[in-house]
C-alpha cells in the first residue's frame, strides 16, 4: 500500500513539474490510476508492479460493460499508459502492462455549439450590479471571445490581461503560451469586473493572489466553479438549453469558421498542435447550410 501511494505521489510531481499539466488534467489522471488500483485489489493483486496484460483486458472489459464511452475509456488508457511509462523510466517496475493496449477507435462526433440567439440569452442574465454578476459576465464574454480552455481560464492572472491592446496571454498545454485577442464586449466586461467586482470578492480572501477569476470566498475559481456558474446562468436563461464550458470553445471555433476565418488562424487561436484537431470544427450550422442552399441552388425557389 505504501508503494502505491509513493508511486502516485512521484507521478503527480512529474506531471506538475516536468509536464506542467493543469490541476484539472492531473486530477483526471489520478482518478484513473486510483480506479485501476481499486480494481487490482479486488482481483487480489497487491500492487501496480504485479499487474499483467490480461488484467488490463479485464479492467477495460468492465469499463465497456459499465457503458462508458470510447472517449472516456481512451482517456483512462492514456493516463494509465503514461503512469506505467513513468514507473518504467524511474525503474520502479519492470513491465508496462498497458504497452500493448490499443486505444478504441473513436466515433466521429460533431461538436455541439450554441446558436447566436442562445448566446444572446446567456449574455443577458448576469446581474452586473453585483460583484458576482460582474465576474460571471466577464467570464462568459472572455470564454466566448477567446475560445480558451476552462483549465487555461482558471490560470489567467490580472497581469495576463492587456486592456489597452485587447489581448490575453494564455498558458496552454505543455508550457506553451499564446496571445489571443478579444473584442469590445469582453473588454468592457473585464474592465468593470477588474475595477470593481473582483476587488469586492477579494475582500473575503484568506490570502492575496493575482488570479483573474475568484470565487465567492475570494479564492481562485476552479474548473468545477466555472461549470457551476454556467449551469446557474443557463437555468436563468432557458430551461431547454444544455451547456458545458467546453461548448463555448466549440462555439468560438464554429462561428469563426462560419464567418470565413481560415483554418490555420483558428488552430493558432485554439492552441492546437495538430491541424487535424481543428478540422473537426469545419462542420457548419444547419442555418448556414440552408442559407447557402437557398442562395445558390438553381431550383431552391419555384419561379412564378
From Swiss-Prot:
One of its GO terms (molecular function) is site-specific recombinase activity. GO terms for biological process: cell division; chromosome segregation; DNA recombination; DNA transposition. Coiled coil: none annotated. The active site is at residues 149, 173, 246, 249, 272, 281. Forms a cyclic heterotetrameric complex composed of two molecules of XerC and two molecules of XerD. InterPro entries: CB, DNA_brk_join_enz, Integrase-like_cat_sf, Integrase_catalytic, Integrase_recombinase_N, Integrase_SAM-like_N, Recomb_XerC, Tyrosine_recombinase_XerC/XerD. Residues 2-88 form the Core-binding (CB) domain. Residues 109-294 form the Tyr recombinase domain. Site-specific tyrosine recombinase, which acts by catalyzing the cutting and rejoining of the recombining DNA molecules. The XerC-XerD complex is essential to convert dimers of the bacterial chromosome into monomers to permit their segregation at cell division. It also contributes to the segregational stability of plasmids. One of its GO terms (cellular component) is cytoplasm. Pfam families: Phage_int_SAM_1, Phage_integrase. Keywords: Cell cycle, Cell division, Chromosome partition, Cytoplasm, DNA integration, DNA recombination, DNA-binding. Its main location: cytoplasm. This is Tyrosine recombinase XerC. It is found in: Cytoplasm. Belongs to the 'phage' integrase family. XerC subfamily.
